Amino acid sequence: MSTLYDVVIVGGGLTGLNAAYQFKKAGLNVMVLKPKDRFGGRTESIKVEDYWFDLGGQWMGGTHKYLKELCDELGVKSFPQYDEGKHVLEINGKKVYYQGNISNLNKSYNLEGLFESISKIDELSAELNPDKPYAHSKSKEYDQLTVAQWVEKNVKGNDARSIIDWFCRVCVAAEPTEVSFLFFLHFIRTAGNYGLLADIHGGAQQDRLIGGSQQISEGLAKKIGEKHYTLNAPVRSIIQDANQCTIKTDNGSTYRSKYIVVAIPPTLAGRIHYSPSMPPRRDELTQRMPMGSVIKTITIYDEPFWRKEGYSAEAISDKGPIFICYDDSSHDDKKTAIVGFIAASAAKDWAEKSPEERKRAVLDCYARWWGPKALSPRIFLEKSWKEEEYSRGCYLGYTSPGTLYQCGEHLRAPVGRIHWAGTETASVWIGYMEGALESGFRVSKEIKDKLLNSKL
């Protein structure tokens, strides 16, 4: 008979590997089942010549304590995101320049209604319990609205409306007409406020990792050891009874465990066959939590021509196809690049174009902001996360109206011996590496408490 593990973990991203590391440190026997041939989930680093660029998650924010502690443990070094010079704001056909954090726009440039609107959103989000956003007295009311409906009713000024719509697209990677306003508030609440999400200094985009972010998952995999993970093992069925779980994979293998952690996006968790079946609300949740849509582009140049012209390579645009971009040069400036994002419905539209059409559109964007030198890159890279079979999008799963209020409690609530994890289930920084790590700590504590208490 096969080994009876204490815990089997479905998913080999930051959440699953961090949970596995915590289990191993507690002396528990764990097995991680990873559907792909690599670790990292929604982080993926690619080596170009002698430098690692990130095609997935890449930033370590100023308040990302779990990620910072893990980087220190693994010996991963960080460096500040470059932002010296003028930034571009292109909104409603107008182009202006600003400096410093994006949140500086709240009080500057005479953007009617923006400061008041952001302050109101921060105020409403602060009222939510990040562990139970659905429990707020107005959660049902908020969950009946899309972000677009709330903006239309409550935000004055076309520029302010456009910037909040833009913020929804670049942070949630979905249209404001698709996203529940309750989810939007919850997303902001878990980060702290709008400024922490939008900003570089002190915010989510403060630092980058030398060597790329995927090395965090690879470092965790080394910590748990190769006997405790299996690659290319997509899970297709989970059967549980009063005593144990049986897990079957596409490659024909069978695993047994006392508990299971499903550490993949909810929409992917819904593709697994469960026996007994999931409770109706849990099943409904996985059907109503689609992934965001993002194409991430990296454009490598021979020199940082934008810096010589006094620009930072940071740009905000509601025109697109690039909605936000940053200087993506190496820490030693030996590789100079710009990272840009096509997000929300634009990502789905541009995914249907040819690679050459996408490249030309991105370069045209940069030329519009920084001149004709932008048209001549040395290397152009892109990653459409909707095409990833075992991610189905990025940065995170979001809920449509009417979902979080009715089904939100089932994001984390265990079903028998099955526990749920992943950045979508976090109490802090959902959609970010920090949230992924936090949920790994949370779910490992849940199961360790049960296992260790059962041995007393």
From Swiss-Prot:
Family recorded in the similarity comment: Belongs to the flavin monoamine oxidase family.
Organism listed in the record: Dictyostelium discoideum (Social amoeba)
A GO molecular-function descriptor: monoamine oxidase activity
Gene name linked to the record: maoA
Gene3D superfamilies from the UniProt entry: 3.90.660.10, FAD/NAD(P)-binding domain (3.50.50.60), Guanine Nucleotide Dissociation Inhibitor, domain 1 (1.10.405.10)
Signal peptide: none
Keyword Flavoprotein on entry: yes
Catalyzed reactions: a secondary aliphatic amine + O2 + H2O = a primary amine + an aldehyde + H2O2
PTM sites of type S-8alpha-FAD cysteine: 394
Full protein name: Probable flavin-containing monoamine oxidase A
UniProt keywords, alphabetically: FAD, Flavoprotein, Oxidoreductase
Cofactor: FAD
Lineage: Eukaryota, Amoebozoa, Evosea, Eumycetozoa, Dictyostelia
EC number of the protein: 1.4.3.4
